[in-house]
Amino acid sequence: MPELSLFVWWLIGGVSSLFLLLAIYLYFFSYRPRAVENCEIVSNDERKTLPAGKTLKVMTWNQEFFGGRNHVYFFDLPMDKGKRITVEEAEMKRNRDHLIKVVKSESPDVLLLQEVDEGSSRTRYHDQEGELAKKLKDYPYRTSAYYVKSAFHPHRHILRPWRMKLVIFSKYSIDEAKRYQLAVKPALWIVRLFYLKRCVLEARIPLSKGGHLSVMNTHLDAYAQGSNTMAKQVKGVKRLLDERTEAKAPWVLGGDFNLLPNDMARKQLTKDQAELYNPHTELSY
């Protein structure tokens, strides 16, 4: 009996140690942003305000981590059924150079980017924001916000680092930048810990006659059918817009909403395509 008791205590100790290691892993490797956070601003020393009466040109682009549209990546399909996982170096360079060429040609005042990778295994650990900054010299002001940030992501197709963010490039100064957390898709608690933390990134650009223009960038959820996640996220974005409207503060919003403009649009899709969207567009909320 004493030997059995000793074995039981060893077993309890071993299981407790495993739970402790799991708790440490979850704490250090999961991303748990606060509801509102300040974001780092990169700029030169010159302060450049937006002139009164100027027409502002804004470009928004989901760059899809420079992966391009020639492949179906695992997260491009429901249940992660896509085949491709990693982007080839040549593809990334070609897609990055194409984005830079278009931006320089269109010359927007503000550039909103989604799905910008940094130190991710799928994009061979490139700093995509930094690479763009070196080429887009006309945009000395920028800020960014993560919506995936994991040194080791437990998804079966990843199992390595994954970091992805929203980025705003601007020709004009950014005085303040904030990240606003949106609703997270319902799931088991451990899945929610590592699930994408969708958000809104706001950059406040100073106006020459005083005050600021709020420029907001977002990327809402996809494949959230059967839940009210998208509706909650739309309401979260609308709340931010309403607050600025009530304060008589000018704003502009762009990004990838993963939504249809109206219910009629869904009827024009194939059956398989329509199943990716709820029967009624969340934009009606």
Residue ranges and their predicted role:
Residues 82-89, 116-119, 183-192, 219-228:
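Surface-exposed cleft-lining segments at the edges of enzyme active sites
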Residues 2-135, 146-154:
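N-terminal, active-site-proximal structural segment of metallo-dependent hydrolase catalytic domains
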